[in-house]
Amino acid sequence: MIYLPDGVQDFLPEEYKFKRKIEEKFREVFIKFGYQEIMPPTFEYNDNFSVLFDENNLYRFFDKKGNILALRPDVTTQIARIVSTKLKGSFPLKLCYVANVYRYDDPQVGKMREFTQAGIELIGTNHEESDAEIIAVAIEALKSIGIEDFKVDVGQVEFFKRVVEDLELQNEEINLLREFLQQKNQSAIEEFINDKGIRGKKAKFLSELPLLFGGEEVLKRAKELYDTPKLGETIDYLERVYRILKDFGMEEYISFDLGMVQNLNYYTGIIFRCFVKGIGYAICTGGRYDGLLGIFGEHIPATGFAISVERSMLALQKQKKDIIDKSWRVLIKYKENLRSNAYKKATLLRGEGKIVEMYSYEKAKHVDENSFDEIIDMEE
């Protein structure tokens, strides 16, 4: 038996047609918002990625010179490098991509070790209009492929960061608390509070942080729980972003989750995830990463998102949506002496956007005629 490695898959013709259509629709939305497509290399020097990603999650290999290379685990990091080294100058800069990425993680539903991301990066701005635009483009992209009943959960890394700073936690404790918040494990958080002897407002805020999700009333509740100037500014910023999205008519898609934490460490501000009703995993993640370009020598603010194409496919399949345009299929059967005429006819029909296959009568005996919408006989 011949097997594939864990975490990769074949896309058969109909599946791949479905996947390509989704990618095309995402790309079309991005371009209409002014984003220019870019394509970084599939692999780079390992050091370009290991500064942000655990090397155990990278696909690494040596070239013939002994250099350690790695398949890209993320496109945003590559774009940060490109902007810092090759696109310095006029900002804001709008870039988009559709590309495969590679992570040696445990395979999940709709997320293999090789998977496709479609995303945008808005570089050189650090105001609420840019964060609102990023979220708006994500919403428009999902709508463009016909996904319904989805929500964009909006958070801010400042909430988790503030808790960690105030409690002076060690790295191991930070990772443990991050895991509890991701799982919204209330009992584990309560146990954590008791074990660490956390008291007063800090204990109250940490206890309620995983519960701070819902509509804009969540922001008011957060201010009441932990009224500090820094968090007050953070909440005010979220309110301004929300007002812009309301002006765009997108409030029905927005909810807040102030206990949200992201796995990627480069996020510095607003973060968000898109969930489809009935599907328990995010199909899109994004946020602000003002410090990432600094790793490559340029301190430039930026924000963006990535949509999982495979998870978008699963969401559409679950909602029983078919976005493939049904092309008219034509079979031309011809006598050997009429091959030239048959080819001219096929060329004419292909120019009209039809799919045309042509076979001599002898070869056509083995063709499934039921798979065609039209059959043309060229006998004379």
UniProtKB/Swiss-Prot annotation:
Keywords: Amino-acid biosynthesis, Cytoplasm, Histidine biosynthesis. It is found in: Cytoplasm. Gene3D superfamilies: Bira Bifunctional Protein, Domain 2. Pathway: Amino-acid biosynthesis; L-histidine biosynthesis; L-histidine from 5-phospho-alpha-D-ribose 1-diphosphate: step 1/9. PROSITE patterns: AA_TRNA_LIGASE_II (PS50862). GO terms for cellular component: cytoplasm. GO terms for molecular function: catalytic activity, acting on a protein; histidine-tRNA ligase activity; transferase activity. This function is generally fulfilled by the C-terminal part of HisG, which is missing in some bacteria such as this one. PANTHER family: ATP PHOSPHORIBOSYLTRANSFERASE REGULATORY SUBUNIT (PTHR43707:SF6), HISTIDYL-TRNA SYNTHETASE (PTHR43707). Required for the first step of histidine biosynthesis. May allow the feedback regulation of ATP phosphoribosyltransferase activity by histidine. This is ATP phosphoribosyltransferase regulatory subunit.
